[in-house]
Amino acid sequence: MNSNVENLPPHIIRLVYKEVTTLTADPPDGIKVFPNEEDLTDLQVTIEGPEGTPYAGGLFRMKLLLGKDFPASPPKGYFLTKIFHPNVGANGEICVNVLKRDWTAELGIRHVLLTIKCLLIHPNPESALNEEAGRLLLENYEEYAARARLLTEIHGGAGGPSGRAEAGRALASGTEASSTDPGAPGGPGGAEGPMAKKHAGERDKKLAAKKKTDKKRALRRL
């Protein structure tokens, strides 16, 4: 089994162990950390889909990999649960600034996990790894939300507490989670959440501007 533990200086290993122990005992809201006893540089994590988003009700498995240059270099983040999101690539790679140019050694693992959870609330289509998801987010939010919600139901265990419990058991056993109840979660995760309202407002503004322009053109022709 490949591991970067042997490549890290002893004082870095102690710092990582301390933070991981703290995160395990006192994790951020909606996040759980499952340390890999065989490899401290491979952190297994679950993130609950935030309310008011198409990911609500889902439980998403991910991992953080700490490289040999950590913390001088940022960790790499991957979703293990399939997800339809502009900033998540086909292989699960997560694209967020804190894992790239905004990284500093002082940020720590907790900050990274909180930033990734925030990415589920506020996707960034301008740095999309999934171009289709990024395009739909900007042009057709309802379709984007429907696609994201469908994958959440199928892969994210979005069947209420029973589905989330199964996803948690799958993480502990190292197997892929599956939904026990693929029924639509509806509610705030649907097309009426804050993300939908934000994009609906942007579309309304664009539509109003277009109508105004068309009206001016029509008047010029008179």
Curated annotation (Swiss-Prot):
Domain of life: Eukaryota
Family of the protein in this entry: Belongs to the ubiquitin-conjugating enzyme family.
Alphabetized SMART domains for the sequence: UBCc
Domain UBC core, chain residue ranges per copy: 11-157
Post-translational modification summary for this protein: Autoubiquitinated by the APC/C complex during G1, leading to its degradation by the proteasome.
Signal peptide segment: none
Pathway as given in its UniProt record: Protein modification; protein ubiquitination
GO annotation, cellular component aspect: anaphase-promoting complex; cytosol; nucleoplasm; nucleus
Entry annotation: catalytic residues: 95
Coiled-coil residues: none
Broadest EC class assigned to this enzyme: transferase
Keyword match Membrane: no
Entry protein name: Ubiquitin-conjugating enzyme E2 S
